[in-house]
Amino acid sequence: ARGGVWFWPRQFTMNNFKEVFKDGSITTAYVITIARTVIGTFLSLMVTTLAGYALKQEDLPGRKLITMLITFTMLFGGGMIPTYIQYKNLHLLNSFWVYVVPSLVSVTYLLMVRTFFEGIPDSLEESAKLDGCGFFQTYLKIMLPLSKPVIAVVGLYTAVNHWNDWFAGAFYVNDTKLWPVQTVLQQMLTKAMNSQQEVTSVAQALAHNTVSVTSDSLKMAAVVVTTVPILCVYPFVQKYFAQGAMIGAVKG
């Protein structure tokens, strides 16, 4: 009997993608995902660079203690239940901001940014202060323009993390209209893999020599739908990526 697995596709079809976009919620999910990626990345870069520049100051009171406490959070986490309770007390559950606020600062990226700032000559900062620049003016006019490589790397990693995250939507948001695209597709794939109609549909498709949508083909279509948009961002930051990652790795 002829099987359903072929080395070459028997027929070109877009049915897999039609199945992915058949549910209108995918469009809303894309809007939520794009919004959380843009807003979350921008706010995260702002907070991370400000905190990194502050920790770079050698005259900051308790600088070593603050750094030690921040690093401590990399080794020990609070766990899911305490995190859920904390989000509930902060009124973040079932809210768009549950995607943004908890991920404002990543310790790894913070230390990377601080290390990069420490590599900038102090003479530039001192010259800015002699010209009358304060903390924020020096940060905006001196530090940020010189930090494009590390900002590009941190921004790309943060954007990818926001784009790929399905966990927050699945566990902290009950309103399906606030789900990101990853959560929607994860639920869609779960239903497709558990569907008892798949074997029947494949058998009918083989009998009529047509193309059927299976859980595997739907999974591959979902992978394309979710990865292509974020891949389009990479060429714009590629020239900064290697330089910034190398600096963070060598000096971190």
Give the positions of each predicted feature.
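A hydrophobic, multi-pass inner-membrane permease signature
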Residues: A1-G252
